[in-house]
A protein has these predicted regions:
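Conserved alpha-helical substructure of the radical SAM core
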Residues: 28-194
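A short, flexible beta-alpha/helix-coil linker loop
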Residues: 128-132, 214-217, 282-285
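Flexible mid-to-C-terminal extensions adjoining Fe-S/redox cofactors in radical SAM and related proteins
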Residues: 2-3, 7-25, 29, 34-41, ...
């Protein structure tokens, strides 16, 4: 880190500490520091944050002040420093230099599975296909993070399996890498008082608790009592003024309820600060393509989430429909990659093919592997940002990349060929295309009119 960067980073950290004393005065000053630090990068994101700080009519104006009041001050300060400064301002500068130097993708975030084990047996879970016997050791995860930080990566996201099966190790990693931010997708059932206290102590761990909707829907897929355990976990987190969110997957069967205003408002009442919506992916030999949303349903999800974002104090992200904000597919190391519990480096958490293993190569070497370079050379996979994925909306692209790179299936329990996977997406892609093209044209017209 250069002396200039260090000085600017210190200035922002001091501004964050003072923001609680007089938010109306100091929050705009904090953004002034950020604008100076960023040197023109992230203009859209900075403009949105500034509006949320300064415009009382904007829904996130009250949201930010709500967070400042309801989230523990030290926790929120740590999250702001580690996420906005380290992972974005400092990290992105280093990533850009490495991208230019090596002519390959360098990720902003690394997703990894500490274990394939899970304490639940959810119907149709693709992660369950891995079995329950695979683990990355503490030292292996620690080394991945060390290599990642050398590349400017300060954002780590745990998937699984159920990551909190390894919660003692995860807390130790938070302690050792206190300059990073850690997010875990979790069923929430293993969050107890001790773990919540540990989260409050380390300050840099954020859970995203998975729900299928309300109690009946969640328990029918995840097991009796799971919804109650998940909401109990939220109570423990809220009592300690911790920052947490929700993750939910929409399908043809549940889209109406899981994207309903009633469900969304219930999460606000539960104290969640964000929700991450995922489109159902037909991954695995036993996956059900009939659960893929219809074009009409996906269009409705697109419109609902954008409306909620403009009106309600709960930040929503739609992994499939928000590609316009990140320039298309972010997998393959362009923004993130996935390392499973066997050490295989997958381009995406939903695409289980690999030609590299972290136990055999350095992280930087995996970025130059044939499969990840095929991603690098092919992105974006479509000019229509509502058709971003090389599997779901452009299955011919994934077929070609997997075959040309010689990548193999990383599903050790029931290996799925790329032809079998993509065949489940062909019809969906063809049916979605005309709707997506029309919707994207409307989107561009609205954008140009502003």
């Amino acid at each position: 880190m250069s002396v200039s960067t260090t000085v600017k980073k210190y200035g922002i950290e001091q501004a964050i500490k003072f923001m609680y004393k007089d938010p109306e005065k100091n929050l705009p000053k904090l953004m002034d520091w950020a604008d100076t630090f960023c040197k023109g990068r992230f203009p859209g994101q900075r403009a949105a944050i500034r509006r949320a700080i300064e415009d009382p009519t904007y829904p996130y104006y009250d949201f930010i002040r709500h967070m400042m009041n309801e989230v523990d001050h030290d926790v929120l300060t740590t999250i702001v420093v580690n996420f906005f400064i380290n992972a974005n301002m400092v990290g992105c500068e280093k990533q850009e230099k490495l991208r230019e130097e090596h002519n390959c993708n360098i990720p902003w975030a690394i997703l990894l599975d500490p274990t394939s084990a899970c304490n639940l047996h959810c119907t149709g879970c693709w992660a369950a296909e891995y079995g329950n016997k695979l683990n990355l050791t503490f030292d292996e995860i620690d080394d991945i993070i060390r290599q990642g930080k050398d590349m400017g990566v300060y954002m780590y996201i745990y998937t699984g399996g159920e990551p909190l099966v390894r919660k003692a190790d995860l807390i130790k990693l938070c302690e050792k890498h206190d300059d990073c931010i850690f997010l875990a997708f979790t069923n929430g059932t293993l969050i107890d008082e001790k773990f919540a206290d540990d989260m409050l102590r380390v300050k840099n761990f954020v859970p995203a608790i998975s729900l299928e909707g309300f109690e009946e829907a969640t328990d029918s897929r995840r097991g009796d009592g799971v919804y109650g355990k998940a909401t109990h976990a939220m109570n423990l987190l809220r009592d300690r003024k911790l920052f947490y969110g929700i993750s939910s997957c929409y399908t043809r069967a549940n889209f109406e309820s899981i994207t309903s205003e009633e469900y969304y408002d219930s999460l606000i009442r539960m104290g969640a600060y964000f929700i991450w919506y995922f489109h159902y992916m037909p991954v695995g030999n036993d996956a059900s393509p009939e659960l893929l949303p219809t074009p009409e349903q996906r269009t409705e999800v697109y419109r609902r989430i954008r409306r909620y974002r403009s009106e309600k104090p709960l930040f929503a992200m739609d992994f499939q429909n928000d590609a316009e904000f990140v320039g298309g597919c972010i997998a393959g190391g362009r923004t993130y990659l996935h390392i499973n519990a066997n050490g295989d480096v997958d381009p995406c958490v939903f695409i289980h093919y690999s030609d590299s293993n972290i136990r055999e190569k350095t992280l930087l070497e995996t970025m130059k592997s044939p499969l990840l370079m095929a991603y690098h050379d092919g992105q974006p996979f479509n000019d229509n940002m509502l058709r971003p994925c090389p599997m779901l909306e452009n299955p011919e692209k994934l077929r070609a990349m997997v075959k040309s790179s010689g990548a193999h299936s990383t599903d050790l329990q029931s290996p799925e060929t790329v032809d079998h996977l993509c065949a489940k997406c062909d019809r969906y892609a063809a049916e979605w295309k005309p709707t997506a093209d029309k919707l994207w044209a409307e989107n561009r017209a609205e954008h140009d009119a502003k």
